[in-house]
Amino acid sequence: MTDAATGTTRADTFEDPLVIAGEKFHSRLIMGTGGAPSLHVLADALRASGTEMTTVAMRRVDPNAQGSVWDVLRETGVRPLPNTAGCFTAVDALRTARLGREALETNWVKLEVVADERTLLPDPVETLDAAERLVDEGFVVLAYTNDDPVLARRLAQVGCAAVMPLGAPIGSGMGIRNPHNIELIVEELDVPVILDAGIGTASDAALAMELGCDAVLLATAVTRAQDPVLMAHAMREAVSAGRRARLAGRIPIRRYAHASSPPREG
């Protein structure tokens, strides 16, 4: 609808913040920092994406280093989200999360505990164990997990602030391999669902939002694109378009044609 007095439409004034643990974010795109060809390109890509938060692997980046990703985040004003990437046990994840809390003075953490280096698939047993213990220590946990509705429900039950099912293995670019399970997770959970891993291009990000995800987290799809800055902008628009399409409501799928205009009578 258009406001006759101002000429603006609902789309022009659309406000739909992402809320995690009571904090609001205007962008529903969360970025990662790994794989960028240079810090300059990373900074430009973060700006183009419109993101307000980006993950940083605490085991791989020195918080005190100069000329690093930390300088980029300070320059762009993007909030860092400590990540336990590279952890294979709950014990390692707890140690890394505590390091992030001390170094960055935040109790937010993206929990990532993988089973092996070949697949980088989440270890469900270690992930659930780590999540429960981190929540008990007062962390705001955003948990990376498989596209398993039962495990997603358990993670929410132990107190995770957001659950982050994968679309496909990390860095694979295969898109969303099991959209049905993602829909089941969205239907089941009362906490935000963030599609994490496997995104290859903008249409994958749009699909995640159309399936009902609250946000998308991606890194490789942007940082290793031929033009990372242009791809970051594409992802920004895709996430926005997918979210609006979800809220607008798609038409039902029909087996046969259905005329858009009724036949004239008489």
From Swiss-Prot:
Q: Which CDD domains does the protein's record reference?
A: ThiG (cd04728)
Which InterPro entries does the annotation name? Aldolase_TIM (IPR013785), Thiazole_synthase_ThiG (IPR033983), ThiG (IPR008867)
Superkingdom of origin organism? Bacteria
State any single GO MF term: thiazole synthase activity
What is this enzyme's catalytic activity, as reactions? Answer: [ThiS sulfur-carrier protein]-C-terminal-Gly-aminoethanethioate + 2-iminoacetate + 1-deoxy-D-xylulose 5-phosphate = [ThiS sulfur-carrier protein]-C-terminal Gly-Gly + 2-[(2R,5Z)-2-carboxy-4-methylthiazol-5(2H)-ylidene]ethyl phosphate + 2 H2O + H(+)
Q: What is its EC number?
A: 2.8.1.10
**What compartments host this protein?**
Cytoplasm
* Class in the EC hierarchy, top level: transferase
Cellular component terms per the entry's GO annotation: cytoplasm
The residues the record assigns to binding 1-deoxy-D-xylulose 5-phosphate are G171, A197, G198, A219, T220
Q: In which pathway does it act?
A: Cofactor biosynthesis; thiamine diphosphate biosynthesis
Per the record, the GO terms for biological process are: thiamine diphosphate biosynthetic process
Catalytic residues at K110
Keywords (A to Z) from UniProt: Cytoplasm, Schiff base, Thiamine biosynthesis, Transferase
What quaternary structure, including any partners, is listed in this protein's UniProt entry? Homotetramer. Forms heterodimers with either ThiH or ThiS.
**PANTHER family in UniProt:** THIAZOLE SYNTHASE (PTHR34266:SF2)
Q: Which HAMAP family match?
A: ThiG (MF_00443)
Instruction: Write out the similarity annotation.
Output: Belongs to the ThiG family.
Role of this protein: Catalyzes the rearrangement of 1-deoxy-D-xylulose 5-phosphate (DXP) to produce the thiazole phosphate moiety of thiamine. Sulfur is provided by the thiocarboxylate moiety of the carrier protein ThiS. In vitro, sulfur can be provided by H(2)S.
User: What is the recorded name of this protein?
Assistant: Thiazole synthase
